[in-house]
């Protein structure tokens, strides 16, 4: 746990306890991935959890997880020291043999808060983004509960499927970047480098790398996104973000 900032330890420990208490013997393993175990958590980084279970969850179990996680996850617009929790559950047997897109059993994320308040319970679904997530998590993760390394539970994921998932995800991203400018710009930068190198690179590093090879106008906006990601308050209202989003998307399509 020493690689993860100490002020997040209590959140991580509470998530771990919630999963053990309510999933019981169905729980195979809990793993952290993303910036928390790669380049280090940034001011606005999520805590990313991948949870592997052996059997489907009931709606009641999912509802309990939502009720228990909500109080310990940062809310959008909140100024507390909590971090956003993003938690994905998969069924191990549904990963073997591998098929793209994979099945997602459950998802918790703060962008779903309004739906949770209306009684929404995430159902099993195919999720193209999950291919990217699993590819990233398998390459680098930290086991916080369970007897198996994640690499033992997941099959090999062809990079051709990662490329397909990136192209699928980019289309949705460029249609929904408003009010999420920083994340959208840097995610596109990371997609570009992933397509080029086969590696999932931290967003700030990806942003700096793509900025270096971008025209000045777009370079400046990308570097603004990096500064925002690192904690600076950036006002996007007067920036022509759509121009840089389109530039990055066109660059991605050429790879």
UniProtKB/Swiss-Prot annotation:
Alphabetized GO MF terms: ATP binding; nucleotidyltransferase activity
Entry-linked CDD domains: NT_KNTase_like
Keywords assigned by UniProt, alphabetized: Antibiotic resistance, ATP-binding, Nucleotide-binding, Nucleotidyltransferase, Plasmid, Transferase
Domain of life: Bacteria
Matching Pfam families: AadA_C (PF13427), NTP_transf_2 (PF01909)
Record's keyword annotation contains ATP-binding: yes
GO-annotated biological processes: response to antibiotic
Reaction catalysed by this enzyme: spectinomycin + ATP = 9-O-adenylylspectinomycin + diphosphate
Function: Mediates bacterial resistance to the antibiotic spectinomycin but not streptomycin.
Name of the protein described by the UniProt record: Spectinomycin 9-adenylyltransferase
Organism of provenance: Enterococcus faecalis (Streptococcus faecalis)
Source lineage: Bacteria, Bacillati, Bacillota, Bacilli, Lactobacillales
Protein's gene: spc
